[in-house]
From Swiss-Prot:
A Pfam family hit: GATase
The protein's assembly and partners: Homotetramer.
Residues where ATP binds: 14-19, 71
Pathway given in the UniProt record: Pyrimidine metabolism; CTP biosynthesis via de novo pathway; CTP from UDP: step 2/2
Entry keyword Magnesium: yes
GO CC list: cytosol
Protein name: CTP synthase
Domain Glutamine amidotransferase type-1, residue spans: 292-532
Catalytic activity: UTP + L-glutamine + ATP + H2O = CTP + L-glutamate + ADP + phosphate + 2 H(+); L-glutamine + H2O = L-glutamate + NH4(+); UTP + NH4(+) + ATP = CTP + ADP + phosphate + 2 H(+)
Binding site for UTP: 13, 188-193, 224
Species of provenance: Listeria monocytogenes serovar 1/2a (strain ATCC BAA-679 / EGD-e)
PANTHER family for this protein: CTP SYNTHASE, CTP SYNTHASE-RELATED
Amino acid sequence: MTKYIFVTGGVVSSIGKGITAASLGRLLKNRGLSVTIQKFDPYINVDPGTMSPYQHGEVYVTDDGAETDLDLGHYERFIDINLNKYSNVTTGKVYSEVIKKERRGDYLGGTVQVIPHITNELKDRVFRAARMTNSDIIITEIGGTVGDIESLPFLEAIRQIKGDVGAENVLYIHTTLIPYIKAAGEMKTKPTQHSVKELRSLGIQPNIIVVRTEQPVSQEMKDKIALFCDIKASEVIESRDEETLYNVPLSLQKQKMDDIVLEHLQLEAPQAEMTDWKNLVHRVKNLSKKVRIGLVGKYVSLQDAYLSVAEALRHAGYDHDAEIEIDWIDSEKVTKENVAEIMKDVDGILVPGGFGDRAIEGKIAAIEYARVNKVPYFGICLGMQLATVEFARNVLGLEGAHSAEIEPETNHNIIDLLPEQKNIENMGGTLRLGLYPARIKQGTKAEAAYGTTLVEERHRHRYEFNNEYREQMEEAGMIVSATSPDGRLVEVVELIDHPWFVACQYHPEFISRPNRPQSLFKDFVGAALKNK
């Protein structure tokens, strides 16, 4: 019988529900249990694919091509599992499905309502994930904050699941904030009490309360929360700000959170073997070297827009015993005139993915600087496309060379629409998405990084390198080092006469893990260290 854990949040959003859920998943997996995890987002968008990064942070892509919430990246990195489209559910998806069923006549002429039709669809998404994975435990994080009107159908659905599968098979975890009032020198539990009161008014009694705090939570305070929220003091779990996120599972284990969960769910499992994880955390806290990477993007004011890229850099750093210092460089402020001054202290330059024409020339200036000055360069998606544009302009001498995405009327469309994209009108869900194979050319930097000639990586793009320019590029020193297996689509380019200049069309950051860094990131950081 599958067991169900639901993680809700109160007081404020962005208090670490995703990290809590992912950390618990790691502990349970290390106890020998099979775990899957999903995120319910109450917004009406079908997915975050067309949302601004300023609104949502990065869009995380799964193997099967789902454009999902960035929390799925935390889940995959912590638990080391590959999720799918059933792991991210939005109000938009649910309502779309219910309306489709109504139009098809599935409801036999009945009045379609939030209860039971929307709530049943939500429950089905939980049960479907359980059926598909046959997991011992499924963890479901409910986005937003208790009290939000958008969350009500989700909370009602998870309330009903307890009745559907039995109380012994369901556990509710509520994550709240205990604010520290500096002027008074006190921490306040009242917001937590009110948040739990709101949750209980909806029919959900939390079994565990995780309190986010900057200061230590005293036993007296835990007793007070337990009294007012009708749980044991041992079921109040402190979640402090950590030096590294990867210490959170160890902190939860120290407070026996996994034991409490298994006791509630009437499960028996051996203690979690966390030696490898402890070694990872020890390594992270005791890195002996430093390397500075200039990350050049247009969304750098919200670093969550590049969350997986930053994490993949850090993972590579762990492998090299190096702390990664990321210099967040706004490409809108980079020009040919000031690029040397901006880049003077960086050991490597990375241009990540992106869309649209804003701040493109700043990225191209950064790429030219890396190429000319032999600074290690790593381009991802748009970062690859602009590397070929820069090379076409400044090495091949093709005046006005550009991407058709940015300049549709260019005489030299180095980057053009994929043929299958030319008649597509809708933006959402229509990119080339998900895991695709790439064949790597022998004797290249890409092959040296991967140690193999066939890899699979996750993609998210609509435009592709124009093969009309391939021969000309290669003759001038920018070679195609990986393509799709049929040789049609360019996947990786690199410079022959450069210490490390590699750019890929796919998004390698999505498969990086803290204890298993992605190969190109690992090689790039190694090259940056040599450049110090």
